[in-house]
Amino acid sequence: MFYETIFNFFNSGILLFWGLLLVFPKRRLTQKIIAYPWVPLGIALGYIYFLSITSGTFSADFSSLNGLTEMFQNANPQGVAAGWLHYLAFDFWVGCWMLKNSQEKAVKHPWMILPLLCTFMLGPVGVLIYSLVLLGHKKLIAKTT
């Protein structure tokens, strides 16, 4: 089915971009990727596509845990794909911001590997770890000056 091809394209393709952030953070291509949100915007197009072919998304009750549970229980593959692309886009955007921010603050890249991996796999956990890295970096800078 066509929607499975689109899902696989985004789901597999994002691995290449995360790999660039992790392995080649200073390369010109990586710097372009973190400077402009083209990758998350591209994923957003896939997200819009899946939303457009998903029925019932906008009638879901987002105000209660029961409403969200019901939405997930009744989800079709297109709706699940839309949700997954939502995660891919936001997590990657956050990863790009973290890498760019860490480079501006002169955080050594080995300190960024765990936060980036956790952002890719666990979203907010990566942001928490990055915040701790920044706190430690700030204390280290203060200690040496």
Regions found by a protein language model. Give the residues of each.
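Helical transmembrane-bundle signal
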Residues: 14-21, 43-50, 127
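C-terminal TM-helix exit segments that contain a strictly Trp-centered aromatic cap at the helix terminus
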Residues: 47-58, 129-131
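Loop-to-helix transition at the N-terminal end of transmembrane alpha-helices
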Residues: 28-50
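Structural signature of hydrophobic alpha-helical transmembrane segments
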Residues: 5-13, 81-85
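Hydrophobic, aromatic-rich membrane-embedded alpha-helical segments
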Residues: 113-136
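Short aromatic-rich membrane-water interface segments that cap or initiate transmembrane helices
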Residues: 1-2, 68-82
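Alpha-helical transmembrane segments of polytopic integral membrane proteins
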Residues: 16, 92-99
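N-terminal signal-anchor/start-transfer transmembrane helix
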Residues: 9-31
